[in-house]
Amino acid sequence: MKIIILGAGQVGGTLAEHLAREENDITVVDTDADRLRELHTRLDIRTVAGAGSYPMVLRQAGCEDADMLIAVTNTDEVNMIACQVAHTLFRTPTKIARVRATAYLTRKGLFAHEAVPIDVLISPEQVVTDHIRRLIEHPGALQVLEFTGGLVQLVAVKAYYGGPLVGQELGFLRRHMPSVDTRVAAIYRRNRPIIPRGDTVIEADDEVFFIAARRDIRAVMSELRRLERDFRRVVIVGGGNIGERLAEHLEHSHQVKIVEHNLERCTQLSERLDRTVVLHGSATSKRLLEEENIEDCDIFCALTNDDEVNIMSSMLAKRMGAKKVLTLINNAAYVDLVQGGEIDIAISPQQATIGSLLTHVRRGDIVNVHSLRRGAAEAIEAIAHGDTQSSKVVGRAIGDIDLPSGTTIGAVVRGKEVLIAHDDVVVESGDHVILFVIDKRRIRDVERLFQVGLTFF
């Protein structure tokens, strides 16, 4: 696939890295020649220096015969104009744009072929807000991913010493919980992936990814770790787009406080939010945290654009008694360094956004992609089509499907029915199949499984 990426920042660069590994023809456009040189040295891609919204630059990048344009520069207007130019002058089939400003996102009908012709709109702030919201709804989870409109969830938790399932084989799970159907999709032990089998033994400190119907998630979590009580008192640092959206979602069911250093922004937040307490000050101030009784806080969310402020305020809050801290970290290289110590959960907004973009690049009928483990693994939702002669999955029991190495099927969703992927479950045409792929090099093989052909014999 020939893809043009506008913007060589964190998202654009990471996306180029993902797609270049998958044998795509990638061209990256940016005004920063130094950044382009760095990418070109590392990756097998073309680069073009220039403004991504200029027709001549798009032509130079190969827009005349490109399959897809992905506009992820830091400027909404550049992204929108680039999609308009690509549509009007080059008839580019698929145009994806990152748009941050709520002023654009709330205008119905703005993004349509007869208006601003963007086929797929990505709002990083909304993606990250939804990600944090799910973590707050599931205390103790490291990740919570949704599939098929929320019917199925894939949850990552850390197994704890003394947990009912620690030291037990996975086959014990079904016998121990006969009324709850679940499947362990993957285990990470000391950062190394393990493909689970019935005789795999769960060890303390394993990071366990399990899949279940939404209604059964808490029951399964209770077997792997101590269930934490629901979060009620939430402190948000940073009143930007993410902080405001999260507060707006939580304020009617939680006690929410926002700490914001900009006085004008504080005034805006106090006018827009109904029940949220808005505090003017610095979250790195020990005095402010003491005055707000930070030791009573159930979860402290540091969501500013400044990694240093987020990390330092989180560490301070944790030392002063906050029960859980969640930290937004824009520099992806820092995520592994800080998570697991005083910072309970570190979130990379770039990594969260990448999955939304990859969903629209995958071959076959792939409707949902989540990038995991800093891009090393993926969770995929694919729709099975065809029949026993044209499909490699339809009409076959899961135990008989020739899955690529390192790939597991976690669940099959048929209409509103959730079928956990035991070996005797037979896939039907139209089923949504949830897969976990621990090795990104196998993604193409997974896509081929769900591509319908005249025959595959």
UniProtKB/Swiss-Prot annotation:
Q: What name goes with this protein?
A: Trk system potassium uptake protein TrkA
Q: Which gene encodes it?
A: trkA
Q: Where is the RCK N-terminal domain?
A: 1-122, 231-347
* UniProt-annotated binding residues for NAD(+) 1: G7, A8, G9, Q10, V11, D30, T73, N74, R98
One GO MF term on file is:
potassium ion transmembrane transporter activity
Provide the function of this protein: Part of a potassium transport system. Required for the activity of the TrkH and TrkI transport systems.
Q: Any keyword Kinase?
A: no
PROSITE patterns from the UniProt entry: RCK_C, RCK_N
Could you say which residues bind NAD(+) 2 here? 233-261
Q: Which UniProt keywords apply?
A: Cell inner membrane, Cell membrane, Ion transport, Membrane, NAD, Potassium, Potassium transport, Repeat, Transport
Please list the residue ranges annotated as the RCK C-terminal domain: 142-226, 367-452
How is this protein positioned relative to the membrane?
Peripheral membrane protein
Q: What is known of its domains?
A: The RCK N-terminal domain binds NAD and possibly other effectors. This is expected to cause a conformation change that regulates potassium transport.
Give the species: Halomonas elongata (strain ATCC 33173 / DSM 2581 / NBRC 15536 / NCIMB 2198 / 1H9)
Q: What happens without the gene?
A: Deletion abolishes any K(+) uptake activity via TkrH and TkrI.
Main subcellular localisation: membrane
Q: Would you tell me the Gene Ontology cellular component terms?
A: plasma membrane
Q: Does the keyword NAD apply?
A: yes
- Check the record and name the SUPFAM superfamilies matching this protein: NAD(P)-binding Rossmann-fold domains (SSF51735), TrkA C-terminal domain-like (SSF116726)
Localization, per the record, is: Cell inner membrane
